[in-house]
Amino acid sequence: MDSLVADVVIVGFGAAGACAAIEAADAGARVLVLDRFSGGGASAVSGGVVYAGGGTAQQRDAGVDDSVDAMYYYLRLEVGDVVSEETLRRFCAGSTEMISWLEGNGVPFEGSLCPYKTSYPSDKHYLYYSGSEAAGGFRDAAKPAPRGHRVKGPGTSGKLLMKRLAEAVRRRGIQVLPQTAARNLIVDADGTVTGVVVSTLRDAPARVRATHRKLAAYAAKPGIYVPSLRKSLHRRVERIERRYGRELRISASRGVVLAAGGFIANREMVREHAPAYRGGLALGTSADDGSGIRMGVEAGGATAELGRISAWRFITPPSAFLGGLLVSETGGRIIDESRYGAAVGERMIADHEGRGWLLVDDAIVREVKRDARGQSQWFQGLQVRYLLRQRVVAGSLEDVARKAGVDPAGLVASVEASRSGADPTGKPPEFARPLDRAPYSLIDVSIKPNLGYPCPMLTLGGLVVDEETGAVRSGAGVPIRGLYAAGRTAVGICSRSYVSGLSLADCVFSGRRAGAHSALDRGSVDKNENVF
């Protein structure tokens, strides 16, 4: 078996892995980054939104008054006790510096504030309310502020985020070994992690590597939207890896950082830990198979929050849809419609088996048709058209309920309650509508496999880490020497509750933490050793 040596070996080249590599290299370590495919991971297929606040330059440019305390008090409601108060406070206090650090590494942001509530803004806007900050029950506890900092680029800008981070990695001379899958950690007799065994295609024929690269790219996108296509392409990827992969032993003199993503692409793990979440769209790549978590567990690492999955049932854009009522088959309200999509999805799955209908009247439908184009990305526009085509329409509340299979009396009661004063779910008054203009429509927004109206899902749990260093903790709570984890391979800021941008922000936060501390661990590479 051939071998290589580095100070720090990083498994995974998404946002967490890239940030870990940059920090480790800046601390003086010789770094080797591995990626099963060609880098980017789930970060590259994301929207490129980074959650930040406390007075960033972009917020100031937009005239937004925000503070570290306001950000902290809001996130405390979302995060709960998944991380300590000290860690969350440190995350919030370092938020403005995080954006500056990303900008220093070539990632562009802009303070163009989105004037309407949306799940993801159009290319005119790059700062927006990306969570439930202004929703009922939150706005009174913490001063709301837009904190979704979208990377400035067309469409879903995660690809630009990763392009710039990858460039920053390579500018530092950090070595990246693509098309290399980590298989097992190397652990010495005292439990210290000293390296990783991989299977690499680096010596495979060029045509084979090109085919593998192309298949993996198509499996990531558009395969993300067509699971059967992804499955077929991934089988071909695995055949290439089995035939041409060569085993390689890589020693890490200071540490290994697991930044290999979550496990949303591993349907068996999803079935085991979160069986109610099997009807969504796996947001990520085929490499989000839990392999990083598995390797950490095999080395003695503990896990937590594996049952936590973010399922985004967005009803915007356009923002006019927020005036509707989200109801169950009993006709009762499900949640404040202005809440973030993951909160909506969680409530629907936990309490209503993923089923729900959005009631709108003719006035809202007219606004939706008027605003859809100006408030939507192309893919959001397709979803709006799909929803309008699939809606059930009738002249009265009772008739539309019967046509949709919703209890008429329950629906009428919900509408009357929403008109009577303070909204029963706490929906802010600026989103409330009288719903008094027939005809009425009920739109099926149930969570199920549906290309026209998919429900993206992302796993949130992972390996338990030391919150000061990012070192993986054992079942006894002791840090495992030489082993670190970051991003969705680890428990982090967003592992209890997710809002847009919080996962990427945690990838930056935890990746930098793991990279910096792994670079300080143990000895360094002898310059005469076989360094990649």
Region locations from a protein language model:
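N-terminal Rossmann-like FAD-binding beta1-loop-alpha1 element of flavoenzymes
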Residues: 8-33
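An anion/pyrophosphate-binding glycine-rich loop and adjacent beta-alpha core
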Residues: 293, 302-410
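Conserved redox-cofactor binding core of oxidoreductases
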Residues: 92-246, 267-268, 415, 419-442
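Glycine-rich active-site loop/strand segments that organize a redox cofactor
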Residues: 51-91
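Glycine-rich loop(s) and the adjacent beta-strand/alpha-helix scaffold that form part
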Residues: 204-314, 510-513
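Glycine-rich FAD pyrophosphate-binding loop
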Residues: 26-47
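C-terminal structured subdomain/cap of oxidoreductase catalytic cores
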Residues: 22, 32, 248-249, 374, ...
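A glycine-rich dinucleotide-binding beta-alpha-beta segment and adjacent secondary-structure elements
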Residues: 410-493, 497
